[in-house]
From Swiss-Prot:
Protein name in the entry: Uncharacterized protein UL-1
Chain spans, region Disordered: 169-433
Superkingdom: Viruses
Keyword terms, alphabetized: Host membrane, Membrane, Transmembrane, Transmembrane helix
Main location: host cell
Transmembrane regions: 36-58
Native source species: Psittacid herpesvirus 1 (isolate Amazon parrot/-/97-0001/1997)
Biased composition, class Acidic residues, residue ranges: 216-227, 234-254
């Protein structure tokens, strides 16, 4: 409850301070006595007397003093006679009286034209802020010394007197922090009791954002950088692709078909097993592991449209096909081939091993070129240049998937749902007897 700067309080606030002081003492003592009931009821009677005896009390519709008397008698009721059969009956009677009194006082918070009590006081008062049907009084507990020092919490005593007597309310408050300005009444940086209702100061820790540069400062060597200062993935792929093209790598010798052209994740198990067998035969696990890691980390997608050889000459067809291949794979990094694989293709590895193992060939045995001469719009798959090994199990897998996809659209049929619970298929419905 705040006190007006000029010291003038609303008469209702005077009554509420007595109620809070009595409730606080009951909570501290852990019990209720008849004297608390008597003090609160006496304070309410004094409030009614003050309101009726004000120099100027104005009402728009009726006599304000007569209206106050009638409504206050309804609040008091028959509780003036303190004859209770038990302590529980006394507590229930006190709570009922307190609820009626608070409802009666809450109407003074409303403006007269909104229906309050229709009464205006012709002197400046501070408005009352209370709840309508209940009263909640919360005391902030003292913070243990293990969490914060006792010097961080100070207590301020608010004293005032009324017709009932002297009222003192102890309000916990916070000490002034170092470097915080404010009036001091008792020295030692303690807060003035009149300003004890001031809330704690919010402490905000600045969040420092550090920019990290993996490849150097932004703009170095003409590379574009993202927000974090690192190089963009697209720039790294383009740089790797340009470096591979400069090295003169043969496309047909190191690009194999993947199921990624069908919109699916490629299966790396066959390549991992082939890399492990090659590392065991070569006796060098480090080179095989390095090649396998570089191959697994790269996602190669090929989408090349071939044309008919009948419409063009052989030279023009080869040049345009190579140009399309380079353009389609310009932004995809390619794995580097080890020297051991090149020796195996030429047969030098088998000669050096003394005939212990046959020569290993990683280049495709055949090149399958799909010639798109059809103008049908029902074609569901674009023409793709297939570069595969005959012993590669992915060859059979990809061809099977393509054949199944083509036959699925014949006759406008849709694939049958695998789940028997969709659209009521496969359900055993009870027979009607």
């Amino acid at each position: 409850m705040e006190v007006a700067r000029d010291g003038i309080m609303h008469p209702v606030d005077d009554f509420l301070m007595v109620v809070k002081a009595a409730m606080l003492e009951m909570m501290m003592m852990g019990k209720m006595a008849e004297r608390y009931y008597y003090y609160v009821q006496l304070a309410f009677k004094m409030l009614v007397g003050v309101l009726k005896n004000l120099p100027v009390v104005y009402s728009y519709r009726y006599d304000a003093r007569e209206y106050i008397t009638e409504t206050s008698n309804a609040v008091l009721g028959d509780d003036e006679v303190f004859e209770f059969g038990s302590s529980g009956e006394m507590v229930n009677s006190f709570l009922a009286f307190l609820r009626r009194a608070l409802d009666w006082c809450a109407k003074f918070d409303e403006p007269p034209d909104m229906g309050g009590h229709g009464i205006e006081f012709m002197y400046p008062t501070r408005p009352t802020r209370i709840q309508r049907s209940t009263m909640g009084y919360f005391v902030r507990p003292k913070v243990p010394a293990a969490i914060v020092a006792d010097a961080a919490v100070a207590a301020a005593n608010l004293h005032f007197s009324n017709q009932v007597g002297e009222v003192s309310v102890r309000v916990p408050s916070r000490d002034l922090q170092p470097g915080e300005a404010g009036p001091s009444s008792s020295g030692g940086g303690r807060r003035d009791p009149a300003q004890a209702n001031r809330g704690p100061v919010a402490r905000v820790t600045p969040f420092v954002v550090e920019r990290r540069y993996e490849e150097g400062e932004p703009g170095e060597n003409g590379d574009e950088s993202d927000e974090d200062g690192g190089r963009m993935d697209g720039d790294e792929d383009a740089a790797q692709s340009e470096q591979n093209n400069d090295d003169g790598m043969d496309y047909e010798s190191d690009v194999t078909d993947h199921s990624s052209a069908w919109g699916e994740e490629p299966d790396r198990r066959h390549d991992a097993e082939a890399g492990e067998r090659g590392s065991e035969r070569s006796g060098s696990n480090s080179e095989a592991d390095e090649r396998r890691r570089s191959y697994e980390n790269d996602d190669i997608q090929v989408d090349v449209t071939s044309v008919s050889e009948d419409s063009e000459s052989d030279g023009d067809f080869e040049e345009r096909r190579d140009a399309r291949i380079r353009g389609a794979t310009a932004d995809a990094p390619r794995p580097r081939r080890g020297e051991r694989e090149e020796d195996d293709e030429r047969g030098e590895g088998a000669a050096n091993d003394g005939g212990r193992r046959p020569a290993r060939r990683d280049s495709p045995d055949s090149v399958i070129v799909i010639d798109d001469t059809s103008s049908s719009e029902d074609e569901t798959f674009p023409p793709v240049l297939w570069l595969q090994r005959r012993d590669d199990p992915r060859t059979l897998l990809s061809r099977t998937r393509r054949a199944a996809s083509r036959t699925r659209t014949i006759g406008g049929t849709r694939p049958r749902s695998r789940s028997p619970h969709r659209r009521g298929e496969g359900r055993d419905l009870p027979e009607d007897n």
